[in-house]
Structure formats: structure tokens, C-alpha cells
């Protein structure tokens, strides 16, 4: 392509051109970011340009840089890696390379860049912007470009997206790709469980993460690993003895497998590397364990992104374009982050500087400082893991007068996360000297079968729940029955078995149960004990919290189902699938965003004949312009409570009838499949942390009188995730959750923090207010 032809790109006044590139190591979710940037740019009257192979494409120019249109990014959401390529470009580190990149930016008329990558990629981006005026001056002074060519491009806007499986950036809760990588690790370790147990083997599993131990720490928690090595927390001298002691105790309890998780950057306090082979040798020689080493390697980067990475990359991509359009010449380059569970922007330079400071702190042996600069929850997770992994330690056991008989009960529909949470409660209780007691099959089980043999009220032991780390459903049984169904017998059982605290896990029914017990304290002395609710519901509808256990597992299951259905729809050509989703509005809306659905029908929105007619007309427009294009199948998600008239089947039939043979439509119902199988890593690690927090709260009431407990509003609480904060909120009182955030009629919170997602679903499908594809 000649300079004369290229000149036309900058000489004609066109809409703003926003370039998107991915650089450094690939991460699942990058394609979701590309899709969001492209379609949001088009929605805002801009052009989106792909720059292939990262900064190398920016330097080479030519065919490496081209526009992306609306349909070009169809199907991107479910694809792993990056479809526009990524390389580690040494040439961009040199000024000559950046000079060539600036030349191509001007010639192609691109005046804004969205860069998705790691710290090296974003450091290069910030340097590129700071040098931009000098680079243009040099290109003009050397005759490479003319004053007229560079005049429209005096300012360069750059926005960063954090794409890294390592989650090694400071100041953000998560990076694009980190939870998908964690999912790959957990899938691999879950598979190792079977062979390890069969042969009573030990496995040392080495995971990626460079100098950051986030992946290793979360994998250790999510798989119940016996021991953990991370660079931020090097083991003390003599770690071999400590590790062997813990593993020996676990083996003596009857555990058949041993799992050790080791970060690839693991080191001791002298910064000497701890290798997986060295750990294997310790286990083999000292304990005589048949031990294997499994280095997961690049398998962690691959595969389809999990639901979290899909919606994170999508919302951050949307935010990146908005940031570009709102920037002034004086604005510092921003980076889009997620902080306190909200999408925000921060200073790119400061974020990179803090990340480098964390790495420098480790090299300086300032491990405490390095750990505090990681993910905000890093320290708490590590502390909780360490405490629960050192059961029988004399320093952890409480005095006799502080020990409690803690009853554990599951209430409501089964939800993934119930078992891992129960496992964590049991482990914590045994570590601290408490007695964990399982109430089987909910309140009806307590009332009807506590006298049976075996009874429904049974003490739990360490080995009994040891393998529940990834089990879905409820192994102690759950039931929707409530205390008021038989309040007299419930009180008698509480008194008979001398419960000192009640740990309730479940959804809105569990919330109702705790409310009933709290209100019945005036009549029944047995209920004057601390009560705590850990929300677990695929519907994510427990008042007071933004997150319930099981909702992530269910969402991933539904998204996988939608991916398979979409594949069928696309293979068949012009097909529409209407998928019915359980789990209140949250599941349908979040799945629509993560699966790239055309639209979502929820009770909040409702559905009318007019809105359905508009959507059918939109489908006609879409299919008429496809002309046999690939991946042309469409997806509509409908919550099962949306309408009693317009059922999933009815909607599909109406669409099919109105299509008049131009396209097909079918309704599909995943049903209870949506509850999921194995628990997702996010549900596992949150179950662990929330269970520990709940137990720490219950311990504060040890030794108090029944009257003191009854008069303390914090003695009946629900644990809540609000933004990224974990709070224990009182159920009762004028400012309690029951009064301020409970919609009893609809069985959900009054505050719905995820409703803004619906706008993103419509925007990225092209189904905006006029139901027309943007030109």
C-alpha cells in the first residue's frame, strides 16, 4: 500500500478511529474485550480497528491493521485466547520501533488505542503516549510525514485493560483471565483426585503466576490442598518438617490423597527457588509417599472463558470506549479496573508502578509489603487457609469455656457451595475445639427424624466432610420447610441437643427461617443463641448481599448450555433458540451478557405483544442482512417467572410463525441441569472465606447469657458481600436487613445492583431502542 493511498486515511475527516490490540501473554476473556470495544465504538459513531499481533502489528502496519465491523466479532465471547493475535514485541521497547508505530498510527488515522495486556504491555503504552509529541515532530522533521498529515493527530488517547491470568496487578480485584485460569487448574486437580486416592499417592502440582502467588493460593483453597508454596509467603526454615507433620496428621486421619500446590515463583526466605522436584523428594524420602509432579503449564491459559471473565471483559471493554471518548489532551492514561465489585478507572502509570513495587518488595525480602500490594483479599485468604490447615495446633484451640456446640443446617433448594461451606465450618470448629453438629434434611428432618437410628442430628468428623471441597448439592440434605411449621418440636430439639449456635446455609427460605427463629426468642429460650446465615442460592436473591453461593456455578452451567445451543443454532443457519433460565432475574440477565444473547426477558422488564413484535422485526432485519454468514444463530434468554402467558414454548412458536419460513425458532429448558455439577472455583473460595468469617462472628458470643444474646441485634445476622466488603448485617431492628432490604412478596432484595447489565446486553446485541443494526 503506497503512501498516497494511505494518506487518504488521515486526510478525510471521518469518525474517531479506536485501535484495539492485545499484547503479551494471552488470557481468556480478551476476545470478550475486543467484541465490547468494537461494538461500543460503533454504537458511539466511531470506527474500531484491529491491530494484529500486538505492538508488532502496530510497527508493521499494512494488513496487520484493518477495520472491524459489527458482525466481525460475532461469536468472540466463547473463544479462548485472542483472535487478533499477540506477541511479545522487543522492537517496541526501542525508540525506533515506537517511531514506526507512530507513523502507522497517523497514516491509518488512528488516534486512540485500547491496549489489553500485562504490566509490560501497559508500561509500553504509557511510554508511547508520553513520547507522542516528540515522535510526531521527528517524523515531520525527517520528512517521513508532513505537517498536514500529523495535524489531526496531535493527541493520542490510550486506555489500558488488565489482561493477565496471574492477577498480579495492584489496585484491582481481578484481571481478565485470572478466574478462567483458576478454573483450568481446579479441573486438573479435581481429575488428579481420583488417581491420587486410588493409589494413596501424593501430587505436587505446579501452577503459573510468575512472581505472584494468587493462582496458587486460590487453587489451594479451592482444592483443599494439604500444603502451599507462594512467593509472597516464603516458608520458614525447616519447612520440610512442618509440611511432613501436617501431611502425616492428615494421612493418620484416613485421608488417601495428598495435594501440594506450588507457585512457579515459589521461594524461601533467602529468595532461593523451591522447585516441585525438591518438594517431591521430601515427600518421597521422608514419608515414603508415592509422589508425582504435575506441571500444568500453558493449559492454564487455554479453554473457553468462564462466566466471570466474560462479563468482566465485556463491561470493561464498554468502559474503555467511554473513557476514550471522555478524555481530554491533559487527561492521564487510565486503566480500567474492577474495584469493590464495580468497574472503574485508575491511573495507568500508578497501577503499573504499584505492581512493580510489589515485585521489588519481594526481591528486597519485604514479603509483608508485597502481600499487601496484591489483591485486597489476598492476606485474609492466606491467613484463613493457614489456620484451617493447621488443625490440632495447641495455639488454635480455645479454652473449654469458649467452645461451642455449633449446629449446621441447610435450608431451601440445593445450591453449589453448600458442601464446601459446610466443610470449612467443620474444619474451623475442629481446629478451634468446637463441636460441629449436622442437622440432616433441614427443619423437617430435625423434627421428624432426630430420634431415628441414625438420627438426623449427628456430630461431624474431619474425614466425613474432607472430600466435599468440590461436591455440588447438599450431602446433609436440604429442605424448604420452616421452623414455624412445627416451632414447638424445633425448640425442644434445640434444647435437647444443647445447641450453642446455629449456622444456616441457604437461600430466601433460609433467610425466612432465621427471621422466624429470631422473632420466636421471646417465647422460646432455646432460640436465644447466636444465629448466622450464609446465603446460598442459584437465584442470588438473598436480601442484604450482592452474592450468594451457588450463583456462579449455576451461571457457568447455564452459559455452557447456551454455548452448546448457540453452536446448534449457528450450524443450522437461520435459527433462534429461546432458553428458559431458572434463578430469578439475576441468572437470566448475567447469562445473557456472558453468552452474548440477543435479549433477555425478565419479570422486572416484563414482556408484551408489542415488545415481542419488535424483537421479531429485529430478527428479520438481522437474518436478511446475514446472506449466509457463519455463526448466524440467535439466542434469547427468558427467566421462567417472566410471564404466565408468554411461556418459553409459546414465544418460540410465535417467533417461528411470524418468521414465515425465513428462520426457525425453538424453545429449550435446561431445568435442574442449571444447578450445576462440581462447584465452581469462585463458589469454593467464597464458601471458604465466608464460612470462616461467620464462625469468627459466632465465637464472639461464647460465654454470653441468653438474655445478652437476645438483646444484641448482631446475634442474628446474614453475612453479606457488598461491593468487595464482607459485612455481617443484623437481621432485625429498624436498620436491619429485614426492614430495609427485603421484598417479602417477591422474595428478593429491594436493591437490585445488576440491573444495569440489561443495558449492556441490548447495546452489544445491537438491539437498542430502535431495534436496528447500527450502520
UniProtKB/Swiss-Prot annotation:
GO terms for biological process: canonical glycolysis; fructose 1,6-bisphosphate metabolic process; fructose 6-phosphate metabolic process. It catalyses: beta-D-fructose 6-phosphate + ATP = beta-D-fructose 1,6-bisphosphate + ADP + H(+). InterPro entries: 6-Pfructokinase_euk, ATP_PFK, Phosphofructokinase_CS, Phosphofructokinase_dom, PKF_sf. Residues 1-390 are annotated as: N-terminal catalytic PFK domain 1. PROSITE patterns: PHOSPHOFRUCTOKINASE (PS00433). The keyword RNA-binding does not apply. It is found in: Cytoplasm. Its EC number is 2.7.1.11. Keywords: Allosteric enzyme, ATP-binding, Cytoplasm, Glycolysis, Kinase, Magnesium, Metal-binding, Nucleotide-binding, Transferase. It comes from Aspergillus oryzae (strain ATCC 42149 / RIB 40) (Yellow koji mold). It comes from the Eukaryota. Its cofactor is Mg(2+). This is ATP-dependent 6-phosphofructokinase 2. Homotetramer. Substrate binds at residues 164-166, 201, 208-210, 264, 292, 298-301. The lineage of its organism: Eukaryota, Fungi, Dikarya, Ascomycota, Pezizomycotina. The keyword Transferase applies.
Amino acid at each position: 500500500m503506497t503512501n498516497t493511498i494511505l494518506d487518504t486515511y488521515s486526510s478525510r475527516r471521518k469518525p474517531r478511529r479506536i485501535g484495539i490490540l492485545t499484547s503479551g501473554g494471552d488470557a481468556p476473556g480478551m476476545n470478550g474485550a475486543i467484541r465490547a470495544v468494537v461494538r461500543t465504538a460503533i454504537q458511539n459513531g466511531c470506527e474500531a480497528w484491529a491491530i494484529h499481533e500486538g505492538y508488532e502489528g502496530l510497527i508493521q502496519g499494512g494488513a496487520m491493521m484493518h477495520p472491524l465491523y459489527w458482525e466481525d466479532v460475532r461469536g468472540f465471547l466463547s473463544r479462548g485466547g485472542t483472535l487478533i493475535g499477540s506477541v511479545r514485541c522487543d522492537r517496541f521497547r526501542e525508540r525506533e520501533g515506537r517511531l514506526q508505530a507512530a507513523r502507522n498510527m497517523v497514516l491509518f488515522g488512528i488516534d486512540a488505542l485500547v491496549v489489553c495486556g500485562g504490566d509490560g504491555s501497559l508500561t509500553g503504552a504509557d511510554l508511547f503516549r508520553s513520547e507522542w509529541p516528540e515522535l510526531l515532530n521527528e517524523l515531520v522533521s525527517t520528512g517521513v510525514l508532513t505537517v498536514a498529515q500529523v495535524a489531526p493527530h496531535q493527541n493520542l488517547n490510550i486506555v489500558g485493560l488488565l489482561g493477565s491470568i496471574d492477577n498480579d496487578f495492584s489496585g484491582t480485584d481481578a484481571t481478565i483471565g485470572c478466574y478462567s485460569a483458576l478454573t483450568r487448574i481446579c479441573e486438573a486437580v479435581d481429575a488428579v483426585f481420583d488417581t491420587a486416592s486410588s493409589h494413596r499417592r501424593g501430587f505436587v502440582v505446579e501452577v503459573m503466576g510468575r512472581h505472584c502467588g494468587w493462582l496458587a493460593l486460590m487453587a489451594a483453597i479451592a482444592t483443599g490442598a494439604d500444603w502451599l508454596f507462594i512467593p509472597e509467603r516464603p516458608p520458614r526454615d525447616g519447612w520440610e518438617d512442618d509440611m511432613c507433620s501436617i501431611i502425616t496428621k492428615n494421612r493418620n486421619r484416613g485421608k488417601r490423597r495428598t495435594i501440594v500446590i506450588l507457585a512457579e515463583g515459589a521461594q524461601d526466605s533467602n529468595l532461593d527457588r523451591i522447585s516441585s522436584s525438591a518438594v517431591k523428594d521430601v515427600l518421597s524420602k521422608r514419608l515414603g509417599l508415592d509422589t508425582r509432579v504435575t506441571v500444568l503449564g500453558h493449559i492454564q491459559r487455554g479453554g473457553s472463558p468462564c462466566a466471570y471473565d466474560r462479563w468482566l471483559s465485556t463491561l470493561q471493554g464498554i468502559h474503555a470506549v467511554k473513557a476514550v471518548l471522555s478524555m481530554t489532551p491533559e487527561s492521564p492514561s487510565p486503566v480500567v479496573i474492577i474495584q469493590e465489585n464495580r468497574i472503574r478507572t485508575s491511573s495507568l502509570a500508578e497501577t503499573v508502578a504499584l505492581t512493580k513495587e510489589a515485585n521489588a518488595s519481594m526481591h528486597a525480602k519485604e514479603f509483608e509489603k508485597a502481600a499487601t500490594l496484591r489483591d485486597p483479599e489476598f492476606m485474609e485468604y492466606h491467613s484463613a487457609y493457614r489456620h484451617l490447615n493447621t488443625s490440632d495446633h495447641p495455639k488454635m484451640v480455645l479454652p473449654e469455656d469458649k467452645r461451642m456446640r455449633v449446629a449446621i443446617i441447610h435450608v431451601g433448594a440445593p445450591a453449589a457451595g453448600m458442601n464446601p461451606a459446610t466443610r470449612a465450618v467443620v474444619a474451623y470448629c475442629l481446629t478451634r475445639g468446637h463441636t460441629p453438629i449436622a442437622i440432616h434434611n433441614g427443619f423437617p428432618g430435625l423434627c421428624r427424624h432426630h430420634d431415628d437410628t441414625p438420627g438426623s442430628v449427628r456430630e461431624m468428623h474431619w474425614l466425613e466432610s474432607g472430600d466435599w471441597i468440590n461436591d455440588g448439592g447438599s450431602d446433609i440434605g436440604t429442605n424448604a420447610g420452616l421452623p414455624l411449621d412445627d416451632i414447638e418440636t424445633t425448640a425442644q430439639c434445640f434444647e435437647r441437643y444443647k445447641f450453642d449456635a446455629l449456622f444456616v446455609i441457604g437461600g430466601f427460605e433460609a433467610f425466612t427461617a432465621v427471621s422466624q427463629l429470631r422473632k420466636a426468642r421471646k417465647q422460646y429460650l432455646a432460640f436465644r443463641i447466636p444465629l448466622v446465615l450464609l446465603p446460598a442460592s442459584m437465584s442470588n436473591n438473598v436480601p442484604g448481599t450482592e452474592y450468594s453461593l451457588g450463583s456462579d456455578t449455576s451461571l457457568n452451567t447455564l452459559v455452557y448450555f447456551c454455548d452448546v445451543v448457540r453452536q446448534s443454532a449457528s450450524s443450522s443457519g437461520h435459527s433462534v433458540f429461546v432458553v428458559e433460565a431458572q434463578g430469578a432475574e439475576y441468572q437470566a440477565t448475567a447469562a445473557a451478557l456472558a453468552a452474548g444473547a440477543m435479549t433477555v426477558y425478565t419479570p422486572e422488564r416484563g414482556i408484551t405483544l408489542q415488545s415481542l413484535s419488535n424483537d421479531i422485526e429485529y430478527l428479520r432485519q438481522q437474518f436478511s442482512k446475514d446472506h449466509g454468514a457463519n455463526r448466524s444463530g440467535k439466542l434469547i434468554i427468558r427467566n421462567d417467572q417472566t410471564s404466565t402467558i408468554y411461556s418459553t414454548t409459546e414465544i418460540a412458536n410465535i417467533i417461528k410463525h411470524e418468521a414465515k419460513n425465513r428462520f426457525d425458532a425453538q424453545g429449550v429448558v435446561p431445568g435442574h441441569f442449571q444447578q450445576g455439577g462440581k462447584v465452581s472455583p469462585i463458589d469454593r473460595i467464597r464458601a471458604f472465606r465466608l464460612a470462616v468469617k461467620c464462625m469468627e462472628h459466632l465465637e464472639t458470643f461464647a460465654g454470653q447469657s441468653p438474655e445478652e444474646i437476645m438483646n444484641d441485634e448482631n446475634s442474628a445476622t446474614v453475612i453479606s458481600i457488598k461491593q468487595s466488603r464482607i459485612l455481617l448485617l443484623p437481621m432485625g431492628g429498624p436498620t436491619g436487613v429485614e426492614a430495609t432490604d427485603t421484598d417479602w412478596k417477591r422474595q428478593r432484595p429491594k436493591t437490585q445492583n445488576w440491573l444495569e447489565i440489561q443495558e449492556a446486553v441490548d447495546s452489544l446485541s445491537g438491539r437498542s431502542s430502535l431495534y436496528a443494526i447500527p450502520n
